[in-house]
Structures are given as structure tokens and as C-alpha cells.
Amino acid sequence: MGIRAIVVDTAGTTTDLNFIEDILFPYSAKVLPAFLEENQKNVLVENCICDVQDIALEPDADLARVTEILLQWIEEDRKATPLKTIQGLIWKQGYANGEFKGHIFPDFIEALDGYKQQGLRVYSFSSGSVDAQKLLFGNSDAGDLTDKFNGHFDTRTGNKRFKQAYCNILNTISLSPKQILFVSDVLEELKAASEAGLNVLQMVRQDNQRTGDFKQISSFAEIEL
């Protein structure tokens, strides 16, 4: 295939969706009110609060209202950058306190070593912040995997369901589309990446998963490069 880099989605691809939905999201919702109260004067958190007010079109929203908005966004799985930034900060505390370990599928852990031996570059692209991705892979149940990655992309690169995000990745890593393989479980993301010219594979890890016309795999062990 002439592949020189692999870009992977996280939730549902490298990481069990249940870990995200049943552990990380509820933890961020539980901790959020106290976290905002304690850190509202932190510059990064303060900027996120302002961004929430802007996105919600509520410039005068007080901290209680901002908290309410963010909790609603968590419930809706909203891919808003300020939410993802705050969640990343909350999860950092959780990992540091030993509340949980990042779940990574064993087949991806094994594949990472093979990619490095082949001289392939590996990137992750998630709606979760870059910091949250580093925490996930740096505090995984298999140890620290961060040195096996060449970089990470998040919503600042673009919406994963739009072609432009993948064009932005191409510009950043300076490779042609056909030199990149994108692996995700989400059809809309695969469609957008395909429109940008990337090679794509759909990861199917659940029996009830939506599938389309893209080539499917159920494990990274099935990828032949």
C-alpha cells in the first residue's frame, strides 16, 4: 500500500467505548462542579468558561449556569473544545489519583511495536483533547505508550466528520494522502477521510455496529502493510 503513517481513532478503535462512556464521562460529570469551583481562576479554565459562554450565546452566564451547560454537553456527548479541555484536566487528576487506568485493546498494543519496527509513524485523532489522549496512552493498563506515537490531533485540527480536518492533518505531517491509513469505527469519519484521499479501514468491534461499504477489520492484527 505504500503506507508511511497510520492515524487511529480512539473510542471504539484503540479503546473500548465502554471505558469512555461508563468510566471517563461519568467521572468528569461527577467531579466537574467542584473542579470548576476550585479552578475558576486558573487561566486555562477561565478561558474555557469564556468559550462556553460564547458557544452557548450566554455571555452573562455565571459559574453555576456554565456548569449546567457543560453537564448537558457531557450528556449529549458534545464535541466542544472547551468541554474536552476541561474533561482532560479532570481526567488528569483521576489518572494521577489512581481512579482508573486507560483501556487499550491488546491487539493495538501489539501492533504498535510492529509499526515502530517497520518505521511507520503513528498518530491518534480524537474528539478528546490532545492532553486527554496523552493521558489515555500514558496511563494505560499496559503502561506508558506515549513514546510509540509521533503525534496527536483533536478538535483544534477540525471536525472529524469533515474532509478539511484530514486535509489539515496532511499539511501537518507532510505526507500525501495515499501514504496514510486512517482507522476508525465511525462511518462519517471514514467518509470524510476518504474524501481527502486517505486509505481507510473500518474497525468493527461490536456486533450491533453500523457498517457501510468500507473494508472492515475487527483487530489491528488483520492490517497488512
Swiss-Prot record:
Keyword match Lipid metabolism: no
Gene3D superfamilies in alphabetical order: 1.10.720.60, HAD superfamily/HAD-like
Reactions catalysed, as given in the entry: 5-methylsulfanyl-2,3-dioxopentyl phosphate + H2O = 1,2-dihydroxy-5-(methylsulfanyl)pent-1-en-3-one + phosphate
Gene Ontology BP annotations: L-methionine salvage from methylthioadenosine
UniProt xrefs under Pfam families: Hydrolase (PF00702)
EC number assigned by the record: 3.1.3.77
Keywords: Amino-acid biosynthesis, Hydrolase, Magnesium, Metal-binding, Methionine biosynthesis
Cofactor(s) this protein cannot do without: Mg(2+)
Keyword field contains Magnesium: yes
InterPro entries: Enolase-ppase_E1 (IPR023943), HAD-like_sf (IPR036412), HAD-SF_hydro_IA (IPR006439), HAD_sf (IPR023214)
Pathway field: Amino-acid biosynthesis; L-methionine biosynthesis via salvage pathway; L-methionine from S-methyl-5-thio-alpha-D-ribose 1-phosphate: step 3/6; Amino-acid biosynthesis; L-methionine biosynthesis via salvage pathway; L-methionine from S-methyl-5-thio-alpha-D-ribose 1-phosphate: step 4/6
Subunit structure: Monomer.
NCBIfam families (UniProt xref): enolase-ppase, HAD-SF-IA-v1
Job of this protein: Bifunctional enzyme that catalyzes the enolization of 2,3-diketo-5-methylthiopentyl-1-phosphate (DK-MTP-1-P) into the intermediate 2-hydroxy-3-keto-5-methylthiopentenyl-1-phosphate (HK-MTPenyl-1-P), which is then dephosphorylated to form the acireductone 1,2-dihydroxy-3-keto-5-methylthiopentene (DHK-MTPene).
Recorded family membership: Belongs to the HAD-like hydrolase superfamily. MasA/MtnC family.
Protein name as it appears in the record: Enolase-phosphatase E1
Source organism (scientific name): Shewanella piezotolerans (strain WP3 / JCM 13877)
Lineage of source species: Bacteria, Pseudomonadati, Pseudomonadota, Gammaproteobacteria, Alteromonadales
